[in-house]
């Protein structure tokens, strides 16, 4: 969260983007926890973020402009198209800013983090702090000789769909874990995005949708292990499993 906040201003204020940006953190689970972090010196952060120099100022008699009014139908679609172009531009800006941040911090970021994914047959895809729990389960399963891995998403918008699909294309099956309900009777928002892009590149990877941790409910290594076992049984034994299910429901 700390590192992402430092990068956020540079991304949002870039002349090719100029869009709002949100940094999301697991409420209570990490926001009320105590953990060591490595802070950067203030002067380094200030130099990295820099000063915002707008291309146009609010009061300019030579170029009068309106800021903040709603767009009516003659202009609305064009404004939406411009926002979409800015969102496309944001992908490269995010990577460029991350490269610059790595130079002052030694910490490199991309659209997502891969954990033991390069040779994995089965993978979990998720966002947020629960990835740490999944990593513990992966380490234990790897010790048993099982090829499992994790893809932890860092950037949700613009969605790096093609990059994620290519990173997962070699796997036999993936479990997509959403900590939010999409209310479409078929999985959460992350699930919908990833399945679409796996289809687009023609990947043979099977994808199963899961919902977990709603309302801050705990997610355990036992549950992560069970998800991996379900994927393996589906592929290796031909077992039919629900393609959309909740983890950790009270019976």
Feature-to-residue mapping (PLM):
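Conserved thiamine diphosphate
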Residues: 1-27, 203-217
């Amino acid at each position: 969260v700390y590192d992402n906040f430092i990068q956020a201003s540079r991304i949002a204020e870039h002349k090719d983007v100029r869009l709002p940006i949100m940094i999301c953190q697991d409420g209570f689970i990490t926001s009320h926890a105590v953990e060591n972090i490595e802070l950067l010196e203030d002067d380094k952060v200030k130099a990295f973020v820099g000063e915002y120099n707008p291309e146009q100022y609010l009061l300019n008699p030579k170029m009068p402009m309106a800021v903040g009014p709603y767009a009516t139908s003659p202009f609305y679609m064009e404004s939406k198209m411009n926002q979409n172009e800015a969102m496309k531009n944001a992908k490269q800006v995010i990577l460029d800013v991350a490269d610059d941040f790595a130079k002052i911090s030694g910490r490199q970021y991309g659209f997502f983090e891969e954990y033991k994914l390069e040779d994995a047959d089965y993978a979990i895809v998720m966002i947020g702090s629960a990835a740490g729990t999944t990593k513990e389960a992966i380490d234990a399963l790897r010790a048993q000789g099982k090829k499992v891995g994790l893809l932890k998403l860092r950037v949700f918008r613009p969605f790096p769909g093609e990059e994620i699909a290519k990173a997962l294309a070699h796997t036999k099956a993936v479990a997509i874990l959403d900590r939010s309900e999409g209310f479409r009777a078929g999985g959460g928002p992350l699930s919908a995005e990833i399945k679409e892009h796996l289809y687009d590149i023609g990947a043979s990877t099977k994808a199963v949708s899961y919902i977990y941790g709603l309302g801050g409910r705990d997610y355990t290594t036992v549950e992560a292990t069970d998800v991996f076992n379900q994927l393996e049984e589906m592929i290796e034994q031909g077992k039919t499993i629900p393609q959309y299910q909740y983890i950790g429901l009270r019976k």
